[in-house]
Amino acid sequence: MMSWLTIGVILGLVQGITEFLPVSSTGHLIIVAKFLHFTGSKASVFEVAVQLGSIMAVVVIYWNRFIGLIRPEKNKKFTGLYGIWLLFLTTLPPGIIGFLFHSYIKTLFTIPSVIAALTTGSIFMLISEQLCRNISQRIVTLDELTPKTALGIGFFECLALWPGFSRSAATIMGGMLLGAKRHLAAEYSFIAAVPVMFAATGYDLLKNWDLFTANDLPLFITGMICAFLAAWITIKVFILLISKISLRPFAYYRLLLAFIVYLCIK
């Protein structure tokens, strides 16, 4: 039997590496946890709580941007109340849909559903890359984002409520299809993830607070620390690479993963 701390390290690393890549961290966590025989209510709460580590990695990396939302900077548009307004618009659609259909969404946390989401997301990614060839990528910096674009990305983010689809994939695709450069779509995807993930994680943790025990602290803290470190490195590397590569390699990886998992459970 694998120790709880070992499970925390493995799942923390998996979550941190996959959270901000367009491959679905939730899908990977469900699959890996299943093979580790880490299931049940404790596993479900852990999969939510460990996201806090990944969220904090984004906050640290983009600290100046978040501070700019509190202390407006001159000559920058994505700052102060306007920047908060853009993030609110992006958060609004998935926030409403997620709240209204929270119970139903929880029923989709199954291996077959994740396989379907991985496959569907891959197809969408390949199609979006093809469509973007004919779309002018005119939005280069965060300061060029408009409320219309921010809201549009929010509607795309609703796709990520299907476990296995990938929030990162949905928002990056949405940004690109709405005219943002690939690297900008990725950066905004990371920043916009913070309010959504804080809200979703906080809601789930409060709802399941009675499932926590003092004995769970080492597992959860270990997972969050590993997720933070893995996410920090992954974001740094991904931002350097995303302007040079397309979403296609990630789409093919998702298809391969879905096929392998299908064979394993067949």
Curated annotation (Swiss-Prot):
GO terms for molecular function: undecaprenyl-diphosphatase activity. Keywords: Antibiotic resistance, Cell membrane, Cell shape, Cell wall biogenesis/degradation, Hydrolase, Membrane, Peptidoglycan synthesis, Transmembrane, Transmembrane helix. It is found in: Cell membrane. The chain crosses the membrane at residues 1-21, 43-63, 81-101, 107-127, 145-165, 183-203, 219-239, 245-265. Its EC number is 3.6.1.27. GO terms for biological process: cell wall organization; peptidoglycan biosynthetic process; regulation of cell shape; response to antibiotic. Pfam families: BacA. It is an enzyme of class 3 (hydrolase). It is a multi-pass membrane protein. It catalyses: di-trans,octa-cis-undecaprenyl diphosphate + H2O = di-trans,octa-cis-undecaprenyl phosphate + phosphate + H(+). One of its GO terms (cellular component) is plasma membrane. Catalyzes the dephosphorylation of undecaprenyl diphosphate (UPP). Confers resistance to bacitracin. Belongs to the UppP family. NCBIfam families: PRK00281.1-4, undec_PP_bacA. Bacitracin is thought to be involved in the inhibition of peptidoglycan synthesis by sequestering undecaprenyl diphosphate, thereby reducing the pool of lipid carrier available. This is Undecaprenyl-diphosphatase. It comes from Lawsonia intracellularis (strain PHE/MN1-00). The gene is uppP.
